[in-house]
A protein has these predicted regions:
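Solvent-exposed, non-transmembrane regulatory segments of membrane-associated proteins
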Residues: 6, 20-24, 28, 34, ...
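Membrane-contacting alpha-helices and adjoining membrane-interface segments
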Residues: 1-11
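Short glycine-/aliphatic-rich beta-strand segments at the starts of folded cytosolic domains
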Residues: 10-22
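Acidic-histidine catalytic/liganding microenvironments
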Residues: 40-41
Length: 114
C-alpha cells in the first residue's frame, strides 16, 4: 500500500456532482455550468473543463463537473462553485430534485374505508 499526498501536487481536480430534474434542458444546463467555470478566476485556463451527464437516478440525473485549480485553492473553489451553481440554477428555473414518495390511497368501495 502507498499513500498519495495530494498537498505535494501543484494542481488538483475539482469534481462536483449535482442532480438535475429529468425535464431539465441539458444543453442549457451545460451552457450555464461552462459559463460559471469560465468566470471562476481560480480555475486553471489551460487545463480541461468537463461538464457531463454522469448518471440517471431515481429522482433526477446527475451532472458531473470537473476543472483544475491550484492545490491551495481546491476547497474554497469547490465550495464557491457549488454555491454559484445552486444560485444560477435557481435564477434560471433549473430544478434540483429530491427523493419523493407518492402514496395512493385506495378506497374500499363497499365500506368506504380508506
Amino acid at each position: 500500500n502507498s499513500l498519495l499526498n495530494l498537498t505535494n501536487e501543484t494542481k488538483r481536480k475539482v469534481e462536483i456532482k449535482i442532480a438535475i430534474a429529468y425535464h431539465s434542458d441539458m444543453k442549457k444546463v451545460k451552457e450555464i455550468v461552462y459559463q460559471i467555470l469560465q468566470e471562476e478566476k481560480r480555475i486553471l485556463e489551460n487545463e480541461p473543463k468537463d461538464v457531463f451527464l454522469d448518471s440517471f437516478d431515481d429522482s433526477g440525473m446527475t451532472l458531473g463537473i470537473r476543472a483544475w485549480v491550484k492545490t491551495e485553492d481546491y476547497w474554497k473553489t469547490t465550495w464557491d462553485l457549488r454555491e454559484k451553481v445552486k444560485e444560477t440554477f435557481d435564477a434560471n428555473g433549473i430544478e434540483i430534485p429530491y427523493n419523493r414518495l407518492e402514496v395512493d390511497l385506495l378506497t374500499n368501495k363497499e365500506s368506504g374505508v380508506q
